[in-house]
Amino acid sequence: MAPPSVFAEVPQAQPVLVFKLIADFREDPDPRKVNLGVGAYRTDDCQPWVLPVVRKVEQRIANDSSLNHEYLPILGLAEFRTCASRLALGDDSPALQEKRVGGVQSLGGTGALRIGAEFLARWYNGTNNKDTPVYVSSPTWENHNGVFTTAGFKDIRSYRYWDTEKRGLDLQGFLSDLENAPEFSIFVLHACAHNPTGTDPTPEQWKQIASVMKRRFLFPFFDSAYQGFASGNLEKDAWAIRYFVSEGFELFCAQSFSKNFGLYNERVGNLTVVAKEPDSILRVLSQMEKIVRVTWSNPPAQGARIVARTLSDPELFHEWTGNVKTMADRILSMRSELRARLEALKTPGTWNHITDQIGMFSFTGLNPKQVEYLINEKHIYLLPSGRINMCGLTTKNLDYVATSIHEAVTKIQ
């Protein structure tokens, strides 16, 4: 008699919520269906958009006979790493000029977070110190918890961020949690377009946050997934990162080029490291190299080449910023239109938070029962938290979505 499968006792894992939602949407035959859960840009025809500048650069790469498919270095394409870190920190960054910045090419923003988390678990605040508290915002992108837990951190905590009553930033709660955190704790900060709330601190509020973090010796780990994509302005979206660097912080910044280049399936990311002196960067990168070697060993070239060529060529860079602004402006327009329709319908509650928020997502304030109603009765797919992707809205479905939200709010308490 053959023994049972060695995999017989493996439990079935729960599906990843957002991808389950997308699968349910695809299987829904209702012609009215609307996908507000997808985490990617869509045109007004609800189609993916390949940026024109990306098409142009792809063609140039394809026709460049000097290129080949040799392995990239373990830390990635040098030109890409330099350009990516410069984009985050600014051309005039003292840290760059003083050569105390390093970059690690990664598999998207998630890869940058993971490599950074693995390094911190081994080398931050004492060798192999996985007891260091890691703070993530409440709420946050669900992968933050998983990445740091999987890297071995044992103490993942939440810091207050979202005020449900006023549908905005809970600054006092945030500052209080910073004050009460153990010294040298790690704080995961959203650089701009906070996911899922779409609510960012103002520059003045960032200054207050930085002041407490500096006094308490707290380590900032920025997640920058939407630079340029949030406001349409690269400098504005990187303001917090650059301010922290100007204040003398050592920090990590996980960068993603999925959204602002539309390179979702190329997995283009970078981990920018800022230290106090050049020698530290050399040692940190030497350890990062060891971690990458046993994780993915060498990163892919195509996406990194596209980004590096675009960022290093003034003409292509100008075209790219125009493409990014096109996406950002459409999202801002959909925010204004949705708010206007809900207010015209006299939907109970206040809806100014929709236009106060920024970036791809809006935290609507809808409760789980109202979300369930929208999915089951109206075939409008969104996360149980009430988060919607503004890119899923179009001039063709805005009226239907607004009317459906109005019904959900008035019928379901």
Swiss-Prot record:
The record's InterPro entries line, in alphabetical order, gives:
Aminotransferase_I/II_large, Asp_trans, NHTrfase_class1_PyrdxlP-BS, PyrdxlP-dep_Trfase, PyrdxlP-dep_Trfase_major, PyrdxlP-dep_Trfase_small
- In this UniProt entry, the residues modified to N6-(pyridoxal phosphate)lysine are 259
EC top class, in one word?
A: transferase
Pfam families, per this entry?
A: Aminotran_1_2
| Reaction equations catalysed | L-aspartate + 2-oxoglutarate = oxaloacetate + L-glutamate; L-cysteine + 2-oxoglutarate = 2-oxo-3-sulfanylpropanoate + L-glutamate; (2S)-2-aminobutanoate + 2-oxoglutarate = 2-oxobutanoate + L-glutamate; 3-sulfino-L-alanine + 2-oxoglutarate = 3-sulfinopyruvate + L-glutamate
The record's GO CC annotations read: cytosol
Q: Where in the cell is it found?
A: Cytoplasm
User: Which parts of the sequence bind L-aspartate?
Assistant: 39, 141, 195, 387
Quote the EC number: 2.6.1.1, 2.6.1.3
Q: Glycoprotein: is it a keyword of this entry?
A: no
Cofactor(s) required, per the database record: pyridoxal 5'-phosphate
| PANTHER family registered for this protein in UniProt | ASPARTATE AMINOTRANSFERASE, ASPARTATE AMINOTRANSFERASE, CYTOPLASMIC
Q: What does this protein do?
A: Biosynthesis of L-glutamate from L-aspartate or L-cysteine. Important regulator of levels of glutamate, the major excitatory neurotransmitter of the vertebrate central nervous system. Acts as a scavenger of glutamate in brain neuroprotection. The aspartate aminotransferase activity is involved in hepatic glucose synthesis during development and in adipocyte glyceroneogenesis. Using L-cysteine as substrate, regulates levels of mercaptopyruvate, an important source of hydrogen sulfide. Mercaptopyruvate is converted into H(2)S via the action of 3-mercaptopyruvate sulfurtransferase (3MST).
What family is this?
Answer: Belongs to the class-I pyridoxal-phosphate-dependent aminotransferase family.
What protein name does the entry list?
Answer: Aspartate aminotransferase, cytoplasmic
Q: Which gene encodes it?
A: GOT1
